[in-house]
Amino acid sequence: MRNSIFGLILTLTALILFIPPLQASERGSQTNLPIPRFVSLRTDTGNVRRGPSLNHRIDWVFKRRNMPLKVIDEYGHWRRVTDRDNEGGWVHHSLLSGTRTVIIQDDLMPIYARADPSTLVKAHLQAGVVARLRKCTRDWCQISVDGYRGWAIKTGLWGVEADELRD
């Protein structure tokens, strides 16, 4: 009896120690905001550096205001970001905005009056268009661009997580 209790305790201890915990949302060390998270480029241009300081070389320059970016790390006033092509580097936080935007991935993507493909198509957007993100349901997001507002199928957008819901 003692051996079976000892064996049970040993097994439970091993399970507790070696099974990874359920993934909790990681938080940024500087902002305590979720990592990863989406932001947008606040300015017309933004230097993308190899490391988190002005001493690091500029690898390239983002040249599109409101472009959605994904923050994957934080260090001081710097945010490590990636774009839709998974290219990235370190950008100073002052160049970023919490305003949510998305990039249209599918060419001539229909924008519907409601989150229903049988409703009126209000516009067709070309791949690469940047739109403001409004609301999201499980499969749809409401977006706006150049005076048009409507619903797009979420899988055709970059800048929003597949399971993200927004009111």
For each feature predicted by the language model, list its residue ranges.
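Bacterial N-terminal signal peptides
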Residues: 7-17
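Positively charged n-region of N-terminal signal peptides that target proteins for export
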Residues: 1-5
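SH3-family beta-barrel domains
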Residues: 22-50, 61-65, 72-75, 82-87, ...
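Beta-strand-rich domains and repeat architectures in extracellular enzymes and scaffolds
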Residues: 57-58
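Intrinsically disordered, low-complexity polar regions and short flexible loop motifs
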Residues: 53
